[in-house]
Amino acid sequence: MVEKLDMSAVVGVKDITDNKKIWRQLMAELIGTFFLVVIGVGSCTGGSEWSPSIPQIAFTFGLTVATLAQAIGHISGCHINPAVTVGFLIVGEMSIIKSVLYIAVQCVGAIAGAAVIKVGVSEAVSGLDLGVSSFSSTLTVGQAVLIEALITFILVVVVKGVSDPGRTDIKGSAPLAVGLSIAAGHLCAIKLTGASMNPARSFGPAVVQNMWIDHWVYWVGPIVGAIVAALLYKFVFKVRKGDDEANSYDF
């Protein structure tokens, strides 16, 4: 017998009417994305006086996400990334309303973070660059979308893997694993696309700097990668009751 689809659960009406935690979760996402942009984008903000190194940017983003995940993961899941939120939505692990609210506050937090950077350092730095996402002139638009999709795919697979409730073999720190996947994505692709992996991270600086050239790439690429990763994990990799855990890794 086919199970009847509960549209109210899919839409998520109860997330607003009955969930008293939703406002704490939204505040956590807003603050988390704010600090991701302040610290992460702040690390790639350069001017005529200096230029940040690739390892500096990569590990700043990775360690910032790992730190925030440890701090607010128990409250909101620490998505702080619309692509991650869409990944949870597409496999039915978040409602539509809750996902829209998450993405909205993530974007607000990103704008606020970028604005703080601009206000805080614009007087001290000439030729201020807020780390607006852009891709190499040697790439086509399609290649840029593909690269963003691939590096976000890795991020979301790691997020789904470390948060899989069926796993008993997880060792080490889940937040650190997520952070390292972000650092790896930056080390791989920062010279190619800027390694956004996060539409909100690109949206905040774009709003504050009013720079929109090919901005859509940084929504489409990460979201496509997140959707593919989430679907693959749910239908192929997810641990199910009765799975043989003897195949789990052991160091």
From Swiss-Prot:
The keyword Repeat applies. SUPFAM superfamilies: Aquaporin-like (SSF81338). The chain crosses the membrane at residues 27-46, 57-77, 100-120, 139-159, 170-190, 212-232. Its main location: membrane. It is a multi-pass membrane protein. One of its GO terms (molecular function) is channel activity. Residues 47-56, 121-138, 191-211 are extracellular. GO terms for cellular component: plasma membrane. The keyword Signal does not apply. It is found in: Membrane. Residues 1-26, 78-99, 160-169, 233-251 are cytoplasmic. Belongs to the MIP/aquaporin (TC 1.A.8) family. Aquaporins contain two tandem repeats each containing three membrane-spanning domains and a pore-forming loop with the signature motif Asn-Pro-Ala (NPA). Homotetramer. Forms a water-specific channel. This is Aquaporin. It comes from Haematobia irritans exigua.
